[in-house]
Structure formats: structure tokens, C-alpha cells
A protein has these predicted regions:
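Polytopic transmembrane helical bundles with strong interfacial aromatic enrichment
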Residues: 1-333
Length: 333
């Protein structure tokens, strides 16, 4: 396939690589769920040593050991998948930036594994535990993006509508994704600080809109609630923008509506987490769906940039020859 003006159509020829990338992203999502399960059940220190478990490869699977050891097993699977993905990509992928993405993913999962080990060995220090959670979400985003990059249809869209709102959508989705990531970090601080029920009622806070700020636990909990409100505003703004200016483009409409649906589920799970006294299932699901919200927003962001770039390339192709080179250099810069 000839390279497009934007460079997006020079896709990987390997469907197998794409399928492995999708599998890696899916198993990473499972890893995040299991990690949330470990925290929700208080099992993070059920196995006190690392990388072994009670001095063995396979410990006796009782009580919280099941969750913590299961978390380690899934993590090992993700490391192996990512290693295979990186090696395969280096040999099969033409695009250097995609190869670099695969290598970055492998480096990130190694950092994540080491942070997990340090978290156990140092008995859950807050900073390391939060860094572990933050890296997990970042790695999940990389796997989702990589799965999109290796899709043989990535960027291969023929009908692209270009209007003045395209750059604004790319900017808006980027901000929305960043806000969601920050909100997840605040949630990680709250979880590892043990402040999930510092404000025991919802939607009010101790019966008021604003709670008494008498402890760091209340401060962090209320910050997470305020963050949820900010995320909701940006997500709705993003979806409304897509539906108003890009409703005919299914590559944007579908993830936008998916983002809205997941946001509704996430807010509902957050409420049930409080109402249930942090029951394991809604609390863990809240962590997992939060990751899904982030990944969906990222997918929408990538598509906004890609489709906008393709539209720019299409415009450049229609420009008379004396000007086309200058526009092409501007697009690819």
C-alpha cells in the first residue's frame, strides 16, 4: 500500500500482530481488575515476599493469598505477552514509531512489575502504591493505543469530513483524557490511604454540599468527588461536540457514545461503593470501569487526531501543485 500524505495509511501487514496486541490489552484489563480485587479485599500483603511467595513459586492458595498470587500470575502473563509483542513488532513492523511504542510498553511493564515488588517489600508505602496504580493505567493506555496502531484498517478511511471543529475536537478529547487520568490518580490515593468511606454518604457529604475539612481523609475523598464532577462535565462536553459536529463519522460517534455509557456506569458504581460500605464487587468494578473510561477516551482522542490528519492530507491533495509541497510539510511536521 503506498504511503499516504499523512503517513497513517502505512499500516502493519500483520493481522496476527494486531490480534496479539488486542489480547495483551484485554489481559491487562483483567490485571487491573484483579489488582483492584487485591486492594478491595485487603490482600496486598497476604504474600509478604517477592518475587517468590513464602519462599516458593506456588504457595498454598488460601484466604487472601489467592487474590495476591493470582494478581502476580496474571502480571507474569502480561509481561510475557508484552515481551513477545515487542520482539514481533521489531521484526515485522515497518513504522519506527510503532516499534518504539512496543519497546516503551515493555519498559513500562518492567517498571510496573518492579514497583509492585517494592510495594510488597516495603509494606505498601503510599507513594509507591499510587505510582504502581498510575503506571498500571498508563501501561493499559499504551496497550490500547498499540492495538489501534496495529489494526490493518488504522487510518484507512476514505470519506473524511473536514471542518473548523476538527482541531478543537482533538484538543478537547486530549484534555478530557488527561482529566480522567488525574481523577484515577486521586482515586488511587484515596484507596491506598483508606479514605474511601471518609465521607459516608452520597450524593451529599455529611448531609451538606461541602463537608467539614477536618482530616486528610475527608480532603482526598471530597477531591475525588469533585474530580468526578469535572470528568463528567468534560466527558459530556466531548460527546456533545462529537454529536453536533461529527455525528456522521462512526469512528468518532461510537467511542463517544461508549464513553457516555461507561461514565454513567462508573458514577453508579461509585455511588454503590459508598452505599454498600465498600463492598468488594462494586468497589473492584469501579476501578475496572474507570480504566475502561480512560481507554475509551484515549481511543476517541487517537481517532480525532488520525481523522483530522487524514482530512488535512485530503485537502493537501486537492491543492494545486505549487502549494501542495508546503502544505504536506506542514502536515507531517
Amino acid at each position: 500500500m503506498p504511503a499516504s500524505t499523512s503517513g497513517y495509511a502505512d499500516v502493519s501487514p500483520s493481522l496476527g500482530l494486531h490480534r496479539l496486541a488486542v489480547l495483551t490489552a484485554a489481559v491487562t484489563f483483567v490485571l487491573i481488575f484483579v489488582g483492584g480485587l487485591v486492594t478491595s479485599t485487603g490482600s496486598a500483603l497476604a504474600v509478604p515476599d517477592w518475587p517468590l511467595a513464602f519462599g516458593h513459586l506456588i504457595p498454598k492458595l488460601v484466604d487472601g493469598v489467592r487474590f495476591e498470587y493470582g494478581h502476580r500470575v496474571v502480571a507474569a502473563v502480561v509481561v510475557i505477552l508484552t515481551l513477545v509483542l515487542a520482539i514481533w513488532t521489531c521484526f515485522a513492523e515497518r513504522r519506527k514509531w510503532v516499534r518504539n511504542t512496543a519497546l516503551a510498553a515493555f519498559a513500562l511493564i518492567i517498571v510496573q512489575a518492579v514497583l509492585g515488588g517494592i510495594t510488597v517489600l516495603l509494606q505498601l508505602p503510599l507513594a509507591i502504591a499510587v505510582a504502581h496504580a498510575a503506571t498500571a493505567q498508563a501501561f493499559f493506555c499504551v496497550t490500547v493505543a498499540f492495538a489501534m496502531f496495529t489494526n490493518p484498517r488504522f487510518g484507512a478511511h476514505r470519506s473524511i469530513s473536514r471542518n473548523d471543529e476538527s482541531p478543537r475536537l482533538a484538543t478537547l478529547t486530549t484534555i478530557t483524557t488527561a482529566v480522567i487520568y488525574v481523577q484515577i490518580l486521586i482515586g488511587a490515593v484515596m484507596r491506598h490511604l483508606g479514605a474511601g468511606l471518609a465521607i459516608p454518604d452520597f450524593p451529599l457529604s455529611y448531609g451538606h454540599l461541602v463537608p467539614p475539612f477536618d482530616s486528610i481523609f475527608v480532603d482526598v475523598n471530597f477531591a475525588h468527588r469533585c474530580g468526578a464532577l469535572i470528568v463528567t462535565v468534560f466527558a459530556i462536553w466531548t460527546v456533545a461536540h462529537v454529536m453536533r459536529f461529527h455525528s456522521q463519522e462512526s469512528q468518532l460517534r461510537r467511542p463517544a457514545l461508549g464513553l457516555l455509557a461507561l461514565l454513567i456506569v462508573q458514577v453508579t458504581l461509585g455511588a454503590f461503593t459508598i452505599w454498600s460500605g465498600r463492598a468488594v464487587l462494586p468497589t473492584t468494578a469501579h476501578v475496572a470501569v474507570g480504566a475502561a473510561v480512560l481507554a475509551t477516551s484515549l481511543a476517541l482522542t487517537i481517532r480525532a487526531y488520525v481523522l483530522g490528519g487524514l482530512a488535512s492530507a485530503a485537502e493537501a491533495a486537492r491543492v494545486p501543485a505549487p502549494f501542495s509541497g508546503a502544505i504536506e510539510r506542514k502536515i507531517t511536521a
